[in-house]
Design a protein with these regions (language model features):
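Flexible, glycine/small-residue-enriched loop-and-beta-strand segment within the central core
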Residues: 49-123
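Terminal amphipathic alpha-helical/low-complexity segments used for targeting or macromolecular assembly
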Residues: 1-67
């Protein structure tokens, strides 16, 4: 869990550095839906890995309702993700996003049609 807290801090700090509209880290924490989606995802992913799948999915659905960004709790997201203008973003269950990535509105890392194994792209 401590790793998740550190990653959340790095996400907020990264947004401050990349987005000239951000005033400070508190501005990002309270007012950026892209940050909120990442925050909810990191919590849901942690719970998903502990096999609390239902609670993890519930958290991801709440995040989607509030942010318009859908991230499956099984998706693996690296450090310092920046989601800018994130409406309509979908990140699937087996998607992997590396460190230092930026994603803009309308991006879908969706399924390939396979029923099993790796179904979503890597970034």
């Amino acid at each position: 869990m401590f790793k998740a807290i550190k990653d959340i801090y790095l996400d907020a700090k990264n947004i401050c550095q990349k987005d000239p509209a951000s005033k400070n880290i508190l501005y990002v924490i309270f007012l950026y839906p892209g940050f909120h989606a990442i925050l909810f995802h990191r919590i849901a992913h942690f719970l998903n890995n502990l096999n609390f799948k239902f609670i993890a999915r519930l958290i991801s659905q709440i995040a989607r309702f509030f942010t318009g960004i859908e991230i499956h709790p099984g998706a693996k997201i690296g450090k310092r993700l920046f989601i800018d203008h994130g409406m309509g973003i979908v990140i699937g269950e087996t998607a992997t996003i590396g460190n230092n990535c930026t994603i803009y509105h309308g991006v879908t890392l969706g399924g390939t049609g396979k029923d099993k194994y790796k179904r979503h792209p890597d970034l």
